[in-house]
Design a protein with these regions (language model features):
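Short beta-strand His + acidic residue motifs that chelate non-heme Fe in jelly-roll/DSBH
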Residues: 94-95, 124-126, 141-148
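A short beta-loop-beta micro-motif enriched in histidine and acidic residues
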Residues: 71-82, 101-105, 121-122
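A short glycine-rich, His/Asp/Glu-containing loop-to-beta-strand
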Residues: 48-68, 76, 80-88, 96
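Conserved metal-binding segment of the jelly-roll/cupin
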Residues: 127-141
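Short, conserved beta-strand element in jelly-roll/cupin
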Residues: 80-92, 98, 108-114, 157-158
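A short hydrophobic beta-strand segment most commonly corresponding to one strand
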Residues: 135, 150-161
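Short, Lys/Arg-enriched N-terminal segments with co-localized hydrophobic residues
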Residues: 1-10
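Long, hydrophobic N-terminal alpha-helical segment
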Residues: 11-52
Length: 161
């Protein structure tokens, strides 16, 4: 007899040059990665654009980084979408913790905005430099945009299923 277990996917961090090795992780990643690798983002205005209807959405963000405490006050995760975040300019620090170890939800899940906040503190912090990306699955509670100076990035929202 075989024992079947359901493994949760966890955050991925890597260089853009390595993006395609993750295409097998999710059926919609091929289309999302194609958009990331074949689009000129220089000068693209801030805002949201549907790539494959509501299944894949691209958001350009260009904002000042925020202090750690401010970002951690919005420690978030999503149920409907996987985030693929690509850093273009600046250095972004991101806080992270597994959702399975979070114990203090703040409010309830907002289905309209696809967000659930936690009062918990991140277990780990890491930096994204230009040319690097992070993939955050529903199990990844994250606090983005920590840093000084301007941070320009792409956030791809990929519908889980």
């Amino acid at each position: 007899r075989s024992l079947k277990t359901k493994r949760k996917k966890i955050m991925i961090l890597d260089e853009i040059s390595e993006l395609n090795k993750y295409v097998v992780v999710h059926p919609r990643f091929a289309a999302a990665f194609d958009y990331i690798l074949n689009t000129n983002f220089d000068g693209m205005p801030v805002g949201k654009k549907e790539i494959e209807g509501k299944n894949i959405i691209a958001i350009i963000a260009d904002e000042d980084g925020v202090p750690m405490m401010e970002s951690c006050a919005n420690f978030e995760c999503h149920n409907t979408y996987i985030d693929i975040q690509v850093c273009f300019n600046g250095v972004e620090t991101v806080g992270w913790k597994s959702r399975t170890t979070c114990v203090e939800p703040r409010g309830t899940y907002d289905k309209e905005k696809d967000v659930l906040f936690f009062e918990d503190a991140p277990d780990h912090f890491f930096k994204l430099h230009p040319g690097q990306f992070g993939i955050y699955f529903p199990n990844d509670v994250h606090a983005p945009m920590i840093g000084e100076g301007r941070i320009r990035k792409l956030i791809m929202k990929v519908k889980v299923y």
